[in-house]
From Swiss-Prot:
HAMAP family with a match to the protein in the record: Ribosomal_uL18_B (MF_01337_B)
Protein family (similarity comment): Belongs to the universal ribosomal protein uL18 family.
Sorted UniProt keywords: Ribonucleoprotein, Ribosomal protein, RNA-binding, rRNA-binding
Name assigned to this protein: Large ribosomal subunit protein uL18
Pfam families: Ribosomal_L18p
One MF term in the entry's GO annotations: 5S rRNA binding
Lineage of origin: Bacteria, Pseudomonadati, Pseudomonadota, Gammaproteobacteria, Moraxellales
Gene that encodes it: rplR
Record InterPro entries: Ribosomal_uL18_bac-type (IPR004389), Ribosomal_uL18_bac/euk (IPR005484)
Organism: Psychrobacter arcticus (strain DSM 17307 / VKM B-2377 / 273-4)
Gene3D superfamilies: 3.30.420.100
GO biological process terms, semicolon-separated: translation
Length: 116
């Protein structure tokens, strides 16, 4: 049987293994129907260096499940990464399609100074 969630997790596992091999910081994205989350994780995978999500108090008052909210999260994660001294990351889309909210977050992070 084809399981949509299992297929997404399989894709995510392969991507994370490759990023760990590269040994660079990764920008990981997780989305739910209502919120979107982004984290910068250290190369060894043991430490979250920066995070942003639609649960942050500055974004929570508006709509949280659309591309505009994802753009705001992308801007916020780029600012927090630069404050932590990180400019180059690998993009881990967690097996989600590069489309819609995931794409909006990635493009906003690039426009605000993160290099993928």
């Amino acid at each position: 049987m084809f399981d949509k969630k299992a297929a997404r997790l399989r894709r995510a596992k392969k991507t994370r293994a490759h990023i760990r091999f590269l040994g660079v910081h990764r920008l990981t994205v997780n989305r739910t129907p209502r919120h979107i989350y982004a984290q910068i994780i250290s190369p060894n995978g043991g430490e979250v260096i920066a995070q942003a999500s639609t649960l942050d108090s500055s974004l929570r008052s508006g709509a949280t499940g659309n591309a505009d909210a994802a753009t705001s999260v992308g801007q916020m994660i780029a600012e927090r990464a630069k404050a932590a001294g990180i400019t180059k990351v690998a993009f881990d889309r967690s097996g989600f399609k590069y489309h819609g909210r995931v794409k909006a977050l990635a493009e906003a992070a690039r426009e605000n100074g993160l290099e993928f």
